[in-house]
Amino acid sequence: QFQDGSIVTISGTSMLTFADVGQKKLRLKQGAFTADVVPQPVGKPMIIQTPSTVIEVVGTRFEVEALQAFTTVNVREGNVRLKHLVDGNAVDIPADYRVIAEAGGDLSPMPLPAAENYWKSQLDVQAGGFGKWLPAIKKRPAAQKALPFIPVNNPNVNLSLLSIPVSGRSGPPVVLTPHATFRVRGRLHDSAQVHFGIAVSYDNGEFAGMFRGDLLKKQPVSEIAEEKEFEAVYQLSDFTVDPCVREKQDSLARTPDGLYLDRLWIFTDTGRSSGLMVHEVELIPGEIR
């Protein structure tokens, strides 16, 4: 939060640097953030630089996602000016519109897509998030592979962790319904408990909390088949507040029902590499029977 009350919230594995010496200047090297910017001084808009664009903000609510190949800007309120670094072309993006800026692409603003309740990962292309993306080969589909991760506040724990971004950037926003179910398919070296969490936001893009689907009921061990494959299911009604945000819970949502799904993460806690990789995550707006 800046001194004037403007708020920028990063998500996932994002890299953001900033300065505020007379004018706010941010550089999003990769990842995504949401922002609620109060009106800025005349002639001194907030400047945001991504690998491919420069964005000028006077006062608005918006979201940005930056990858090497393109930048996505969703505007909720106000007006945002985007300039493409490659050719210098610029566009003003009004409220309730978005632009996906890529080399040689059209900068015409498009209406923000309507929210959906069903979602399925698209791992045939690089997903972003945390982990190593593996393209499809003859023996298996494309996958996001977990990487070693040691929590800062618990250095004795060694997890195998991956995350996948979901909502409100290059695709339509995804809203969670009370009886929704997540189904995860992937591979493991050995049978293990597969833990699952989500991050959610309000409809204005503001961070709303983090929840875990494996704490209320102990997640059973995911047994592997002949090809080391596993499937795990998580009911939204079983999700509880993630311990890492429990101290801030008074200011966050108590349940994920009706909120926007921003990203998800999946991990094992076996003390060693589990070989965890995920081929597919599916959100179904109703219980799996």
List PLM regions with ranges.
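Short, small-residue-rich packing micro-motifs
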Residues: 1-64, 69-84
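Hydrophobic residues on conserved beta-strands that form the core of alpha/beta folds
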Residues: 57-59, 75, 93, 261, ...
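Short carbohydrate-recognition loop motifs
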Residues: 134-168
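Extracellular ligand-binding interfaces
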Residues: 154-248, 260, 270-277, 288
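Extracellular beta-strand elements of beta-rich domains used
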Residues: 234, 264, 279-283
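Noncatalytic modules at the cell exterior or secretory-pathway interfaces
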Residues: 256-265
